[in-house]
Amino acid sequence: MRISLNWLRELVQVDLEPEVLAEKLTLAGFEVEEIEDRRTWAAGVVVGRVLEREQHPNADRLSVCQVEIGQAEPVTIVCGASNVRADIWVAVATLGSYLPCIDLKLKPTKLRGVRSEGMICSLSELGLTKESEGIHIFPEDAGLQAGQPVGPLLGLDDVVLDLTSTANRADALSLIGIAREVRALTAATLTLPEVELQTYPELPCLAISLQSEACSHYSGTIIEGVTIAPSPEWLQKRLQLAGIRTINNVVDITNYILLEYGQPLHAFDRQKLQAIAGSSDLAIGVRSAQAGETLKTLDDQERTLAEAALVITAGDCPVALAGVMGGADSEVSQETTQLLLEAAWFEPIAVRRSARSQGLRTEASARYERGVNVTELPIATQRAIDLLLQIAGGTVISQTVATTTQTEPEHSITLRLQRINELLGPVQAEDEELKDLGADDIERLLTAIGCHLTLVDDAVWQVRVPPYRYRDLEREIDLIEEVARLYGYDNFGETLPPLGSDEGALSIDESLRRQIRAVCRGVGLTELQHYSLVKPGSDRQVHLANPLLAEYSALRLDLLSGLIDAFQYNWEQGNGPLWGFEIGRIFWREEDGFFEADRMGGILGGDPSRGRWQRGGKEQAIDWYAAKGVLEEIFERFGLTIEFQPDRQDDRFHPGRTASLWLQGDRLGRFGQLHPSLCEGRGLPAEVYAFELDLDVWLDHLDQPERQVPRFQPYSSFPASDRDLAFFVDQSVTVAELERIIRRQGGALLSEVELFDQYCGEHVPENQRSLAFRLTYRASDRTLTEAEVEPVHDQVRQSLVERFRVTLRS
């Protein structure tokens, strides 16, 4: 927002230099991006009177002028403008002056043999326009005097601050809002425009119907006998300084109120509205748009309205996009003599939805989206009416006000001095000592922004927030932030916060997550992070009600899809196979509601080795057992043993090389090789493996008292006793099931179980396979004897026969 310093000083009596004021505003959250000091644009440029104009003796397109500039003698100036002539008032840059807009310093020079002692300026040379057809000529009736500075005449006696508010506040987009901030920062006197509210008749020629909850206040004022003309020069200059193009006096006044109060207004041509409605008595409505309705807006765009858009209607025909832009069919033109002045409060979300549905953002919508101050709406309306009657003439015929809320909102917050000092800490005193903020400081700072403080207890206030700050001052912490902002963040001392007994400690859950990440990195996996937002495509997905992009309008159902995409992207970029893992949240919907859960996923595959020269350059892709070993190693680091069982529930995996993972009877997740058709379709290596685990189940097993403290076990110094166990068993029985029974029956003496042979084929019964295990028995305190080992080993053998009907071979 561009702020005229002269205009600002009419509202708040601040005499700080622009640079000092800009620094204060920036530190208070109103970042001044540029200081445009227009006073330098015309320094040394004065009003001159062209006394004589003669043709240059050596150039057809040059003129030699005698110009009076308030000195003892006229000066000679060679001018190339085609519109220069005698007896006109012009802007003259005198010798020694510097024009920054064209980077030119004036000095005596000769043009085609004639001495020139200055320059007659165009508006572009003074920075007021981009292009000029000739020199600027002042009106004859302007009461000018030769030698007077041109700055005040052209609006070049001002400084413009281009600032951006970092806070989501509508009042920050108005001159009065900035003036209030300056008053709070500098203790300067605030002088707001004097507005005396008037009561106007309410005639049946105007009826207003609020059919949407998104509009709680709407007033329409009918003014007859207005004259459309250019705005006065002072009004045009203020709008131009703010970067707003001037249209005519009526539209310019509504824009002026927009800048001054931050309240968007809109002026309709009443007679055009009557023609649209087909009646002399207007029925203005506020409602949601209907499917298929269209509206031609002021930018000459024919727009098809979304059902979510909020519209203003006349006779139920859309005439404006509420809070965003008016309609072209009812705009004010040179022939307009009757106005309907709209002043309304629209719900911020509704305006944002309307603007977004049309891809349209305007000065009005920017303020409505932040929430304008409904309590100052009558004041802004009256201010606009006063200016309209003063500048455009006319008479107020009728005013109709429709509201859905009868009481003004009241908002009060309990504020504790102790809490303020706990959060903000001490401030730097003048003697460089640190001290806490006092009650007087708090009352002074908050009163300066319009708050009313009532002391209800020792250093405890009930703070009534001013209406223009209702939307951003809602809690105690908001007021504390205001105290810090107004006092100045740089005025607080450097101290450490008080530490409690458990400050700085990680929660058990976070500590375990970090351990999991460290172990995964230790086995060669890179941590990945993907967006939770994905393309829609499943009924089980949770869809966003108001997405930024259609491609990211749903929440992810799993981590696996993102991991596969990442593997494919890295492979296509020539980065080789990706070994990665991700910890994140997934979301899904069911008939009884929405759900979310934390998951851990991983992907690996291809040939990660670098010794291909030893294999004649051939790749050696990781196989199922090696990939499975990576996952097992992760769990072994935590002292956990997982069980693999056949699984065919996910068609993205190979049906014969996929397993569900179980941890002490709890389903943990799934691991397997990606389906060959999926890899072929995506151009991936033939063997890519992935897993997705339920992180909550994993953490529950890790969050056990016996696992919180590391346990160390010495190596046995006594020899082991090995036994081989071979048998035929049905192919439906998994090795995991067999190993579980073997370990259970082997008890404490059985230290290791290893499958070292599997055979299917000749001499093996049909639908069976031959398996051979090596069992290692060991004790930590003695050498085991045959008498100790054999009974245990026989118990293992017998259990396998009874449980799985195996045929023992050894």
Curated annotation (Swiss-Prot):
Annotated residues for binding of Mg(2+): D472, D478, E481, E482
Matches recorded under Pfam families: B3_4, B5, FDX-ACB, tRNA_bind, tRNA_synthFbeta
EC number: 6.1.1.20
InterPro entries reported in the protein's UniProt record: aa-tRNA-synth_II/BPL/LPL (IPR045864), B3/B4_tRNA-bd (IPR005146), DNA-bd_dom_put_sf (IPR009061), Fdx_antiC-bd (IPR005121), Fdx_antiC-bd_sf (IPR036690), NA-bd_OB-fold (IPR012340), Phe-tRNA-ligase_IIc_bsu (IPR045060), Phe-tRNA-ligase_IIc_bsu_bact (IPR004532)
SUPFAM superfamilies: Anticodon-binding domain of PheRS, Class II aaRS and biotin synthetases, Nucleic acid-binding proteins, PheT/TilS domain, Putative DNA-binding domain
Segments forming domain B5: 408-494
Compartments, record wording: Cytoplasm
NCBIfam families: pheT_bact, YtpR
Protein name: Phenylalanine--tRNA ligase beta subunit
Organism the protein comes from: Synechococcus elongatus (strain ATCC 33912 / PCC 7942 / FACHB-805)
